[in-house]
Structures are given as structure tokens and as C-alpha cells.
Curated annotation (Swiss-Prot):
Entry keyword set: Aminoacyl-tRNA synthetase, ATP-binding, Cytoplasm, Ligase, Nucleotide-binding, Protein biosynthesis
Gene Ontology molecular function, alphabetical: ATP binding; proline-tRNA ligase activity
Entry protein name: Proline--tRNA ligase
Reactions this protein catalyses: tRNA(Pro) + L-proline + ATP = L-prolyl-tRNA(Pro) + AMP + diphosphate
Subcellular location: Cytoplasm
Enzyme Commission no: 6.1.1.15
Gene: proS
GO CC field: cytosol
Amino acid sequence: MLLSKYFLPVLKEEPSEAQVTSHKLMLRSGMIRQQAAGIYTWLPLGLKVLKNIENIVRLNMNKAGALEVLMPCIQPAHLWMESGRFDNYGKEMLKFQDRHDNTLLFGPTNEDMITDIFRHNIKSYKDLPKNLYHIQWKFRDEIRPRFGVMRGREFLMKDAYSFDINEENAVKTYNQMYKAYINAFRDLGVFVIPVIADNGPIGGNLSHEFHIIAETGESTIYYDKKFKTLKDNPDIDVEEIKSWYAAAEEKYEVNKLPISEQEITSSKGIEVGHIFYIGSKYSVNMNALINDEYGKLTPIEMSSYGIGISRLVAAIIEANCDEKGIIWPSSVAPFKVSLINLNIHDSKCVELAEMAYKELSDKNIEVLYDDTEARPGSKFATHDLIGSPHQIIIGPKKAANNIVELKDRKSGVIEDIEVGSLMSVL
């Protein structure tokens, strides 16, 4: 992509309305623009990151055997009345009437609707297990939306819902999804800690929150140092991990630790995922029954699994930034490479830049080629801000000798590379 053709409205100054780092950087880098309190337009750069995260989450859900569906944003209120949850969300749930005086709502979650779909389409234990997920925009009318997309009113979620014949099988599915979450967050390039949590209004008696470790996190997490091995270990024993100690600050009690205090470390965390074993709460309330192997009508066992896709964008920034801007993990970066031509009027610089641009594009490497008239200092500031993992810098002096600079955004290390060796080094 040529920067001269791209829509990248960067801001030089910090926006006064932004309180947290991710909100400031998303506005400054031209990822989003606010339309109303807690409601944002995603501009091209931000949308690329959102889609990259969405695709990685989708891949891991598919690997876990979940099947993608797409439920509507707008839901009939009678389903929520039937499940007994219509009043649970209070004014956070946006309700309205259509022209026929039917009460509708903008869904904050989908347990009620998925249960309705299940009860009308699955009748026998032979059709189980089933695990359905969707990625859809939701709305919760927060009193004080803040921190940009971290706590907006409109947000993108991945929701999955599993259905099993009994508790034993439901817990097996829960563990499979627990593992899928660990793998998904690793693929996203972030370090997460799963913490035992309350089920809240969702219902049920087994639940885990997943917190990204970030210095600016809202929660303090206390956890076994063994969790640090998850960063590089793809072979996960779920039962072993679930036995490791992890607790949010409100549940941390030094005198009740199952291991020594020396084995515990603490970090700030941002919640980005939550999974629940719900049991039969919705199936009983909504009469979602199936015939078991003995022909007896039995309420289905359900679990629910959520990942905040749009919230993840902000959380990843909080965990991967410095004073200059964002430092994207390669897996979610909008562009893997920023190609910076410091002098677009120098024929040798143009020659090397266009050669590198073609080679990168031919290899399907996402590259943003800065072919603008901006000054070198301005170009460096822009590309440090938007956070491409690698920068290829082409200036007249070194270009004359077929040399370009390759900069690693995270470490700041710059090395001289002969242009013919560029692809092999990358």
C-alpha cells in the first residue's frame, strides 16, 4: 500500500479527551474516530488490526471444533423474558419498539437466542455435542463509557456456546475451549493469565477470566510463576494449568495460598476473555430438552465462551507500546513492514524502494510504502507511531551503495543490509 494513497489521519498532539495510553495512540495513529460517547468508526488502519485479531480467533475456534454462525444484533425481547433475564441488565440493555409494537433489544449477549435456536433444531443426544460461535457487534449502554474501545458502548465480541448431554461431557468441552483460548492468545502474541471467576448474571458455577498482562491494567493478578512457561509451550495439559494458582486482587489471601508465597508473582492485567460452564439454567427456563439414550427428556448442559475482539485491540496496545507509539506483535500488525523512502526525488532511493516494495508485495508481506513528501523526522515519527514490526529505511547516502537500513521496532536495533539480501533477512 502506498502511503500517498492511504487514509491515515495521524495526530501530532495527544487528544485531550483520551485518558489511557491505548485510546491516545489509537486516535493519534488514525485507527479510530469517535462518533458519540463510547461509539467509534474504525478507520482503515484500525480495521486491519481488528480483522487480523478476528481471523486468529476464528482459526482457533475452528480448530477446537466450533462451527461459525451469525446471529442478528437485534433480538426479540420475549426470548429474554422467557429466560428470566430481561430485567437483569437494567438500563444497560437498549430496548425499543418496532412499528408493530413488538419489543426488541440490541443484544448485549446471545445465550437466550442460541438456546432458542438449539431447542427448535436439536432433539436427540445423538446430535451432540455441538459448539456454535459467532463474531458480532454488541451494545451495552454504559453510564460512563471510557478508555476508548476498552470500555465502549458498542463492541465486537466472539461468543461461543456449547451443548452437551451431561455435566461430564460439558466439562470436557469446557476444557477444550480453555485450551483453545490459551492457544488463541499465544497466536495473538500476548501473555494471558486464566483466573477463576464468578459467573455473574450469565449463570452457572464454573468460570475463568483471561487477563492480558499489561502495566496499565485495571486489575492486579496474583499467579504461580509456572504460568510464564505458557508463552512458548504449545503442548498444554489443561488439568495441570487449571491446578496452578491464580487470583484477582479481591480474592487473594496470603494466609490461604496453596503454594508458598515465594512461588507467586503479581502483575497488572486487562480482562479480554471469559468462559462459563452454565449448566441447565437456560435449558430449564426455556424448555430446551432432548431425548437421552433412554428416551427420557433431559435439559441440555450449556457453556458460554466470550472474547472481546475490539477490546483486545486496545489491550494489545497497552501491553505493547513505548513513548514513541505502538509496537505491534507481528501476528496482528496492520502492516508487517514500513518502507520509508527518505528522499522521493532521489532516483536511486526510488529504485531501491520500488524494488523492495515489489519483492515484499510478491511475497504477500503487508507493506506500507511511504512515498510522501514529508520530512525524514516526520516520517520516522509516523511509522514509530503506527508500530509496524519492521522498518526498511532508504536514504541517498547508503542507497548509492545498494544498502538499506532494517530497523526492528521493538528493540530499536538498526542494521545495514545489502538490498539483494533483504528478503532472506526478513
